[in-house]
Amino acid sequence: MSGTKLEDSPPCRNWSSAPELNETQEPFLNPTDYDDEEFLRYLWREYLHPKEYEWVLIAGYIIVFVVALVGNVLVCVAVWKNHHMRTVTNYFIVNLSLADVLVTITCLPATLVVDITETWFFGQSLCKVIPYLQTVSVSVSVLTLSCIALDRWYAICHPLMFKSTAKRARNSIVIIWIVSCIIMIPQAIVMECSTMLPGLANKTTLFTVCDERWGGEIYPKMYHICFFLVTYMAPLCLMVLAYLQIFRKLWCRQIPGTSSVVQRKWKPLQPASQPRGPGQQTKSRISAVAAEIKQIRARRKTARMLMVVLLVFAICYLPISILNVLKRVFGMFTHTEDRETVYAWFTFSHWLVYANSAANPIIYNFLSGKFREEFKAAFSCCCLGVHHRQEDRLTRGRTSTESRKSLTTQISNFDNVSKLSEQVVLTSISTLPAANGAGPLQNW
C-alpha cells in the first residue's frame, strides 16, 4: 500500500543520487591532482565511514531486521502448527508476513548499504532483481490488506452475499502473487546501473547508482502517478471506507444474520418476565445470547487489530510515497542546496518502510490473544530447550557418576557376599558329624 519503489524507496537506490552529488564533483574534476592514497582517504572519510548519526541508523536497521525476521517467522509457524488458527483472516496474515520476510531478507541489507555509502555495490543483475522484489512485496502487501478488508466487510456487513472459505483464501493468495509479479515487470526492465562520475570509474565503484532509465520524460511521470494511485491511494481509500462500515456494524448496530438485538434478547430472560415453562428453554436462550455476545467481542477484537495494522501500514509508507511523487513527478530535490536534510528525510523514510514489517508481529502480540499465546509458547520452548539441555548434561553426569559408584558398590558387595558365603559353607561343613570314623572331608 505504498507508492514506494525500490529504486526510489529505501531499498535499492541512492536517494541522493545525481543532484546531490553535484556538490561533490568539484574536488574530483581533476583526479590527477590527488595521489591514490589521498583520494582513497577522502572517499573513506566522506562516503564509506559511517558518521555518528549513521551508527544510530545502523543500530535501528539491525533491530528492525531481527524483530521483523523472527516475528514474522513466528506468525507463520503459529498458524502452521495450530489447526484452530487456520482461519481465512490468518491465512492472509501469513501471506502478509511472507511478504515482510521477503522484503526484510532481500532488500533491507542492500538499502542500509546504499543509504550509508550512497553507492550501489551489487551489480547490474541485482539492480534489476532487488527493486523488482521490493515492488512485488509492496504490491502483495497492498492486495493482501485489501483482501482482508474485503473479507471482513462481507463477513460482518453482508454475511449472506458471500461465504469466505479457507480454499478461497488460498486461491486468492496465489492470484495476489501472480498479479503482483506480472504488474511489476516494468520495474525490472527500466532499472540500470550507471556511474555519476565516469572519470572515476576505473578507480572506484563509488558513485555507482541503480536507477530508472526511461525513453522520455513523460513516461516516468505517468508510471509513478499510476504507481502511487494503484499501490497506495486507491487501496487506502477503499479500505478506510470498508473499515468505517465495519466499525458502524460492530460498535453501533446489530450484526446481520443474528436472531435479534442482544439487548432485546435479555428482556424475556429477566426474572419478572420469565416463562413458566421448562427451564431448558431459558437455558438455551441464555446460551444463544452468550454465544452471540462472544462472537461480537471476537469480531471486535479482530477488527480492532486489523484497523491498527492498516493504520500503521499507511503511516509507515506515507513519507516515502510523498517523497517519491515529489521527486519523480514534480522534479523536486534536483538542485537542492540543503542536501543533508533531503538525505535525512529519505533515509528515515526508508527505515520506516522496514519498520512496518517489524511492527506487524508486535501488533498481533498485543491485540490478538491467540497469537500472544503462541509467541509465549515458542519463546518458552526455546528457553526450556536450553534449560533442558543443561539439565540433561547435568543428569547424564550425575547418572554416570552414580553408575560408577553403584558398580563399585555392587562389586564390593559381591566380594563381601562371596567371602561370607565361603565362611558360612566352611562353618557348616566343619560342624557336620563324622561317620564310620571318616573325617568331614571324606564325607563331603
UniProtKB/Swiss-Prot annotation:
Residues 1-30 are annotated as: Disordered. CDD domains: 7tmA_OXR. Disulfide bonds join C127-C210. Keywords: Cell membrane, Disease variant, Disulfide bond, G-protein coupled receptor, Glycoprotein, Membrane, Receptor, Transducer, Transmembrane, Transmembrane helix. It is a multi-pass membrane protein. Residues 1-54, 111-127, 192-222, 327-342 are extracellular. Pfam families: 7tm_1 (PF00001), Orexin_rec2 (PF03827). InterPro entries: GPCR_Rhodpsn (IPR000276), GPCR_Rhodpsn_7TM (IPR017452), Orexin_rcpt (IPR000204), Orexin_rcpt_2 (IPR004060). It is found in: Cell membrane. Changing E54K: In narcolepsy; autosomal recessive; loss of function. One of its GO terms (molecular function) is orexin receptor activity. The chain crosses the membrane at residues 55-75, 89-110, 128-150, 171-191, 223-243, 305-326, 343-366. Glycans are attached at N14, N22, N202. GO terms for biological process: cellular response to hormone stimulus; circadian sleep/wake cycle process; feeding behavior; locomotion; neuropeptide signaling pathway; phospholipase C-activating G protein-coupled receptor signaling pathway; regulation of circadian sleep/wake cycle, wakefulness; regulation of cytosolic calcium ion concentration. Residues 76-88, 151-170, 244-304, 367-444 are cytoplasmic. Belongs to the G-protein coupled receptor 1 family. Nonselective, high-affinity receptor for both orexin-A and orexin-B neuropeptides. Triggers an increase in cytoplasmic Ca(2+) levels in response to orexin-A binding. It is linked to Defects in HCRTR2 are a cause of an autosomal recessive form of narcolepsy, observed in labradors, dobermans and dachshunds. Narcolepsy is a neurological sleep disorder affecting animals and humans, characterized by excessive daytime sleepiness, sleep fragmentation, symptoms of abnormal rapid-eye-movement (REM) sleep, such as cataplexy, hypnagogic hallucinations, and sleep paralysis. Cataplexy is a sudden loss of muscle tone triggered by emotions, which is the most valuable clinical feature used to diagnose narcolepsy. The N-terminal region is required for orexin signaling. This is Orexin receptor type 2. The lineage of its organism: Eukaryota, Metazoa, Chordata, Craniata, Vertebrata. The gene is HCRTR2.
